[in-house]
Amino acid sequence: MFNGVGWGEVVVLLLIGLFVFGPDRLPKAARDAGRVLRQLRQLANGMRNDLRSELGPEFADLDIRDLHPKTFVRKHLFEDDPVLPPYLTKRTSLDSLLLGDDPPAAPSLTKSSLPRDPAAKDPARPGAEAAVPAAPPGPVSPMLSKVSPSKASAARSVPAQPARSDGPATEVPFDSDAT
């Protein structure tokens, strides 16, 4: 009867009623309050029955509490009660890719999975051969042949500069309509 009202609150309300109405008028006020509540319930039940009879038999199982926006959304999001027609709820392979039903496992980035030599990352990648020259052009001086391995690997990791041509530079034309 008292949804959300505990016994402590009921006792406080009775004490307030006792002080406001006094011990002589409190029983009559309680009877009047009970009568008003009973009439309100009958009025609400009558309106609910009239609504169900007006809507017809297809809405006989309609629950008025389901019409509250929060319960409506909660019911249709968390239960398998479709609001949309079945052809609109059918999932396609594109939906499964976008929503990620079976997401691919992300590669783990640990020290053991990373390549040790930064120059030898991916030989299939275009331009990987140009990053590490096989042999320096021209004659090799005896001083360079005895370079320490750490300096040699540092020299190998420096990418080769692209050759510059002295010809006229071709600029990309600017199209003001395209932007």
Curated annotation (Swiss-Prot):
Please, one GO biological process term?
protein transport by the Tat complex
Give the InterPro entries listed for this entry: TatA/B/E (IPR003369), TatB (IPR018448)
Pfam family, any one: TatA_B_E
What GO molecular function annotation could you give as one example from this UniProt entry? protein transmembrane transporter activity
**Membrane topology for this entry?**
Single-pass membrane protein
Main location per UniProt?
membrane
- What residue spans carry the Low complexity bias annotation? 98-109
State the UniProt keywords alphabetically.
Answer: Cell membrane, Membrane, Protein transport, Translocation, Transmembrane, Transmembrane helix, Transport
Kindly list the residue ranges recorded as spanning the membrane.
2-22
Report one GO cellular component: TAT protein transport complex
Q: Where is this region: Disordered?
A: 98-179
Q: Where, per UniProt, does this protein localize?
A: Cell membrane
Alphabetical list of HAMAP family matching this protein:
TatB
Assembly mode: The Tat system comprises two distinct complexes: a TatABC complex, containing multiple copies of TatA, TatB and TatC subunits, and a separate TatA complex, containing only TatA subunits. Substrates initially bind to the TatABC complex, which probably triggers association of the separate TatA complex to form the active translocon.
Relate the protein's function as given in its record. Part of the twin-arginine translocation (Tat) system that transports large folded proteins containing a characteristic twin-arginine motif in their signal peptide across membranes. Together with TatC, TatB is part of a receptor directly interacting with Tat signal peptides. TatB may form an oligomeric binding site that transiently accommodates folded Tat precursor proteins before their translocation.
* Family per record: Belongs to the TatB family.
| Protein name per the record | Sec-independent protein translocase protein TatB
Taxonomic lineage is:
Bacteria, Bacillati, Actinomycetota, Actinomycetes, Frankiales
